[in-house]
Amino acid sequence: MKFEDLLATNKQVQFAHAATQHYKSVKTPDFLEKDPHHKKFHNADGLNQQGSSTPSTATDANAASTASTHTNTTTFKRHIVAVDDISKMNYEMIKNSPGNVITNANQDEIDISTLKTRLYKDNLYAMNDNFLQAVNDQIVTLNAAEQDQETEDPDLSDDEKIDILTKIQENLLEEYQKLSQKERKWFILKELLLDANVELDLFSNRGRKASHPIAFGAVAIPTNVNANSLAFNRTKRRKINKNGLLENIL
């Protein structure tokens, strides 16, 4: 179906076509109606056309008015919009999306990523500076406190100083004994574990019976054997300590 046939029969197409023709020939955009720059050139063109030629008949007058309208709507391709009394803007830059500037989506993502990176770095640097400043303040405070303590000379007698040093020495000796016992305990446990692994590897069955079974807790062991220092080869009798309790085998 041709467009002419459709235009002759369809009311909706007729309405759309009439509205389009009306918009192209008559309708002037609102921003051009309010623009004094457009009005100035519009009036100047009208005066020039009236001064240059005078229509002799009604047909010539209609043709002249039609040509004037066509000239006024198509001559100014760069529409200048007045922002204020001084600044003006070319509407061609924003006519595709009024109120917004057309941008590239990828460029927006790049700009947003750059902005996020810059803000992250700025915040990171600020946190680092604040932390260093706080540490510096604490060091200054501690140094000032130490200087105050050094300036204060406590009035203690020689006997009191000797008592304090004696208590410090006793505490250090007690701590040393505890650490020595703990070290000895872990050494024995390590030797115990190593010897047990060796004996299990040597006397494992592996499909046959061992001719000499393992005698855990045996007393008759040569003195030159390392097993003498191990707990499971010692006599099972446990000693009683000074408090009346059984002593740990370790």
Swiss-Prot record:
Positions of modified residues (Phosphoserine): 157, 211
Cellular component, GO, one term: Ino80 complex
Bias kind Low complexity: ranges: 52-70
Broad class of the protein's primary localization: nucleus
Keyword Disulfide bond among record annotations: no
GO biological process, one term: telomere maintenance via recombination
Location(s), subcellular: Nucleus
Domain of life: Eukaryota
Keyword Cell cycle tagged: no
Region (Disordered): 29-70
Alphabetically ordered keywords of this record: Nucleus, Phosphoprotein, Transcription, Transcription regulation
Role this protein plays: Probably involved in transcription regulation via its interaction with the INO80 complex, a chromatin-remodeling complex.
Note: Present with 2300 molecules/cell in log phase SD medium.
Assembly, per entry: Component of the chromatin-remodeling INO80 complex, at least composed of ARP4, ARP5, ARP8, RVB1, RVB2, TAF14, NHP10, IES1, IES3, IES4, IES6, ACT1, IES2, IES5 and INO80.
Protein name, per record: Ino eighty subunit 3
Native species: Saccharomyces cerevisiae (strain ATCC 204508 / S288c)
Taxonomy of the source species: Eukaryota, Fungi, Dikarya, Ascomycota, Saccharomycotina
